Amino acid sequence: MTEAEIKDKVYDIIVSKMGVNKDQIKPESKFSDDLGADSLDTVELIMELENEFDVQIPDEDAEKIGTVQQAIDYIVKK
């Protein structure tokens, strides 16, 4: 899967889980500040990323994923 395909899937998950429009999402968007996620939203988003991309994201890594691009970069590395 290419980085562009991963980005598209991550954006789709964010739209689905957080109820934002795709055009509101930018790579530098912060889940909490820019997209309105609370801590539960963030946990659910991480779980959905794990399911969609078949990766395990340990809590210590999940805490470091605060922006859309950080999520994409993490998945690309796995």
Swiss-Prot record:
Keywords: Cytoplasm, Fatty acid biosynthesis, Fatty acid metabolism, Lipid biosynthesis, Lipid metabolism, Phosphopantetheine, Phosphoprotein
O-(pantetheine 4'-phosphoryl)serine modified-residue sites: 39
TM stretches of this protein: none
CC per GO annotation: cytosol; membrane
Residue span(s) of domain Carrier: 4-78
Positions in coiled-coil regions: none
Highest taxon of source: Bacteria
Pfam families xref list: PP-binding (PF00550)
GO molecular function terms noted in the UniProt entry: acyl binding; acyl carrier activity
Major localization listed first in the record, in broad terms: cytoplasm
One GO process term, biological-process aspect: lipid A biosynthetic process
Pathway linked to the protein: Lipid metabolism; fatty acid biosynthesis
Cellular location(s): Cytoplasm
Signal peptide span: none
Posttranslational modification: 4'-phosphopantetheine is transferred from CoA to a specific serine of apo-ACP by AcpS. This modification is essential for activity because fatty acids are bound in thioester linkage to the sulfhydryl of the prosthetic group.
Gene3D superfamilies: ACP-like (1.10.1200.10)
Family: Belongs to the acyl carrier protein (ACP) family.
Summary of the function given for this chain in its UniProt record: Carrier of the growing fatty acid chain in fatty acid biosynthesis.
Protein name listed in UniProt: Acyl carrier protein
Gene that encodes the chain: acpP
